Structures are given as structure tokens and as C-alpha cells.
Amino acid sequence: MPKPEIHPTWFNETPIVCDGKPLCYIGSTKSELQVDIWLANHPFYTDSQTIIDSEGRVERFMKKYGINSTND
């Protein structure tokens, strides 16, 4: 018998969202999954030579955790 209250909540219909639009639905422990790049907008698959302009990893981390980037 599994222990009660140790397992995460399971969502059967979790949307994968890109640019504010749900792309598909999967089962997950998260209520919503955000992606920046998807098959439909990836430069390799769309034959475009544009550079994807997104925030760098450090900037996203600092923004996520509310860290001020000024040197005090």
C-alpha cells in the first residue's frame, strides 16, 4: 500500500503553452507547461534564418527569483 500524502498531484489534461496558445495536452504533475520554442516556430523546421531573441539563462534566473542585478 503506498504511503498517503507523499505523491504529487497528477493532472490528466496539462496544456503545453507557447506564445499564449495551448499546443497539446499531456499528463503531468504541473498544471501548465510553458515552452519558448516549439516545432511550429523553431527556425530549423520553418526554414527561417532568424535568430531567436530570448532572455539569457542568467537573466531568467534573476527575474524568476527576484534578484536585483545592480552591484551595491
Curated annotation (Swiss-Prot):
Pfam families: Ribosomal_L31. Transmembrane segments: none annotated. InterPro entries: Ribosomal_bL28/bL31-like_sf, Ribosomal_bL31, Ribosomal_bL31_A, Ribosomal_bL31_sf. One of its GO terms (biological process) is translation. One of its GO terms (cellular component) is ribosome. Keywords: Chloroplast, Plastid, Ribonucleoprotein, Ribosomal protein, RNA-binding, rRNA-binding. It is found in: Plastid, Chloroplast. One of its GO terms (molecular function) is rRNA binding. Belongs to the bacterial ribosomal protein bL31 family. Type A subfamily. HAMAP family: Ribosomal_bL31_1. Binds the 23S rRNA. PANTHER family: 50S RIBOSOMAL PROTEIN L31, CHLOROPLASTIC, LARGE RIBOSOMAL SUBUNIT PROTEIN BL31C. Part of the 50S ribosomal subunit. This is Large ribosomal subunit protein bL31c.
